[in-house]
A protein has these predicted regions:
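Active-site mouth loops of central-metabolism enzymes
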Residues: 1, 49-59
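N-terminal beta1-alpha1-beta2 module of alpha/beta enzyme domains
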Residues: 1-42, 48
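Structural preference for beta-strand elements that scaffold enzyme active sites
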Residues: 15, 46-50, 75-79
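Short amphipathic alpha-helical segments at helix-loop
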Residues: 19, 49, 90-94
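Histidine-centered beta-alpha loop that forms part of the nucleotide-sugar donor binding/catalytic region
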Residues: 20-21, 50-52, 81-83
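Generic structural signal for well-ordered secondary structure
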Residues: 27-31, 54, 61
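Flexible, glycine-rich active-site loops centered on histidine and acidic residues
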Residues: 55-118
């Protein structure tokens, strides 16, 4: 993955993103951790990550995203998704509640970034 970031920079790509799909036949690297490592090879262009909000605790996610955003002067772009039933089942999440969990997670993250107590 680190080599891919370097190759993307050398190829002149405009942005760098990682996904959040825990159920995959391919090797999966936790997005926050791998993106932090990839930044050393990326440079100062926009970067970001997808997070399937129903699968995340909002306080942990708010901390991780704020940390990532602080690692580079380049813009960090947060992508938010709902996920599918396979992702939820793998994490023990009832995906019938995914829209509510998504909205709640986003509200808590925004409140924390504004300095509010939650």
């Amino acid at each position: 993955m680190v080599e891919r970031a370097s190759a993307a920079r050398q190829a002149g790509l405009d942005s760098l993103f990682v996904g959040d799909h825990h159920v995959t036949p391919f090797p999966y690297f936790q997005n926050s951790v791998i993106l932090a490592r990839m930044l050393s090879e990326w440079g100062d262009k926009p970067f970001g990550a997808l997070y399937l909000l129903p699968l995340w605790h909002p306080v942990i996610l708010a901390e991780q995203v704020a940390t990532l955003a602080s690692l580079s002067p380049a813009p960090f772009i947060l992508q938010c998704g709902l996920g599918d039933n396979r992702q939820g089942a793998a994490m023990g999440i009832n995906m019938k509640q995914k829209v509510g969990r998504f909205i709640s997670c986003l509200e808590v993250i925004r409140a924390l970034w504004q300095g509010c107590s939650v």
